[in-house]
Amino acid sequence: MNKILHKRIISLLLVLLLAISCISCNARTNQETLQSRFDTFMEEMFVQKVQSDSLSLNYSLARPEQYGITMTEATFGRCSIESMNEGYSFTENQLSRLLSYDYDSLSEDQKLTYDIVKDYLRTDLSLGDYNYYYECLGPTTGIQAQLPILLAEYSFHDKDDIKEYLRLLPRIYDYFEEIIQFEREKSREGLFMSDAVAKKIIAQCEAFIADPGSNFLITYFNDKISRYSNLSKKEIASYQAQNTEIVLTRVIPAYQMLIVALQELLGTGTNDAGLFYYPQGQKYYECLAKYKTGSGKNMEEIIAMLDAAIGGGIADITTLTLSDPKIIDKYMDFRSFPITDPEAILQDLKTDIREDFPGTEEVKCEFKYVPASLADYLSPAMYLVPPIDSYQNNDIYINGSDEKTLSMIYTTVAHEGYPGHMYQCVYFRSQNPAPVRSVMNFTGYDEGWATYVEMYSYQYAGIDKNLADFLRANNIVILCLYARADIGIHYEGWDKNTAMKYVMNYISDATIAETIYHTLLEEPAIYLPYAVGYLEIEGLKKKAELILDKKFVTKDFHRFLLDIGPAPFETIENYMDLWMKNESK
C-alpha cells in the first residue's frame, strides 16, 4: 500500500514538474516573442523615419536595399500645416504602440531604447500646438542656408545614387513653393518673421545665386563626379550637363522665387522683439528649449544653472588674475595655437586623448572649406554625420581657410572631430545600437558633448596652463551669457535695451553687444543646446565624482556617456545611478 502511494506521489510530482516546466517554457517563449516584436517595431520606426525624404535616406544609409528600403519618389519632404498635423497624428499612434509593450519583459538594451524613444515622441508631440511658430527659414540654420552643403555632400555610392540625386535636385522648386505657402500662412496668422531677419535671408539667397554659371552646386558637382572612378568620360560629361541644366533652370529659379516671396511679405511681421511677445510665444519657447536641450529642468532651473555657471566662470577668471599678474597680458597677446593645420590638429588630439577617453576604430576624415558664397551665413565649422552603415568616411567643413581663422581652429577641431562629434559618432555607431536611435535628434547631448570636450581640449593645446584655464573660463562665461540672454529675450520678454545692458555687463563693446542681440533674436534657442548640454554633462560629472569619490575614473565616466549615446539627460542620469552602484562595489 505504501509502495503504491509512493508511486502515485512520484507520478504526481512528475506531472507537476512537467506542468511548471511548460509554464516556464511558455513564459520564456512569450517574452522572446514580445522582444522580437519590439525589435520589429523599432525597425519599422527607423524605416519610416529615413523614408520621409531622399536626403534623410542618403545621409542615414549607404545601402538602403539591405534594409528592404526603396524610394519610389525623389522628395525633400513636406513643409505644410497638413503634413505637420499628419506627422503628429502618426507620432501619437507610435507612442500608443510603444506604451502597449510590457516594459519588464524587454531586455536591458531594449529598455534603454524604450525610455529614449518614449521621451523623444512625447517631446515631439509637445510642439504640436504651435505649428505656425515653427520656422524652416533662418539666417544660420534655415533650410535655405543648409541645403547647398547637404546637396553637395549627397553620397554617391554607385550610379543609382547619382541618378537619384539628379531626380531629387529639380524638386527643390516645388519644395520652396511649399515653404513660401507656409510663410504666407504664417503671415496671415501674424507670425511672420521680422523685416530684419527676412532681409538677411534675402541677402543670403542673393549671394548664393550671384554667379549662376559658377554656382557652388555646379562647380562642386563637376569636381566630385570627375573623381568618380566607375564612370566613363561620356557618362561624366552627361551627368555634368544634366546637373548644370537643373541648377540653372530649377535651383537658382527656386532661390529667386524665395527672394521675391520674402520681399512681398516684408512689413507683414507683427513683432520685432522676442517670442515672448507672440500670443503663445513663451509657452512655445519653453517646449522648444526642452526639445533643443534634452534637459528635464524647467526654465527657472535652467536660468539658475546658467547664472551659477557665469558666476563660477568669473570667479575662476578673478582667481587666475590674482594668482598670475601677467595673465591679462598673456590673453591680450594670444594670437595663435601652436598647431594650425586642421589635419595635424586632429592627429595631435587622437594621441592626446588616449589617457582620458576610450579608444575607437580608425576612420577617415576629410577637411573641406565652406564656399565663399555661403561663408557669411554658416557656422564656423560643421561635422556631417555619415550613414550608419558607412561611418568610416567623415567630412568636416571649416568656414574660412585664411591664416586668422586657422590660427584659432584647435578647439574647433576638437569640437567637430576628436574627441567631439566625429569621435562620439564613430564610437556610438561601432556599438551597433538599434538603428532607430541614429535618427532621434538629441541636440543637447550632441552639442553638449562636443562643447564639453572642446573646453576639455584646452589642456591639450600646448599653451601656458594658466592661459588655457583663462581661455576656457572666458569661453564658458560667453557661451552661458549668450544662452542666458536668449532666455531673457524670448522667455522673459527683455527688450533690446534690457538685453544689451545685460550683455554689456560682461562685454563693453556696444557694437558687439548689438550683434549678439540680433543673432539671438533671429534664431531662438540657437545657443541653448551648447550651453545647457555642456552644463548638464558637467553636472553629471560632478555628481559622479562626489558619489564615487576615489573610485571615480574620468575615462570610465566618458565611456559611460559614450556607451549610453544620445539621449535626454534625465534618462542618462537614471542610468548613471545604476552605473555608479556597479562602480562603487
Tell what function each PLM region has.
Residues 14, 26-29:
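N-terminal leader/targeting segments and the immediately adjacent pre-domain N-terminus
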Residues 21-24:
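C-terminal motif of bacterial Sec signal peptides marking the signal peptidase cleavage site
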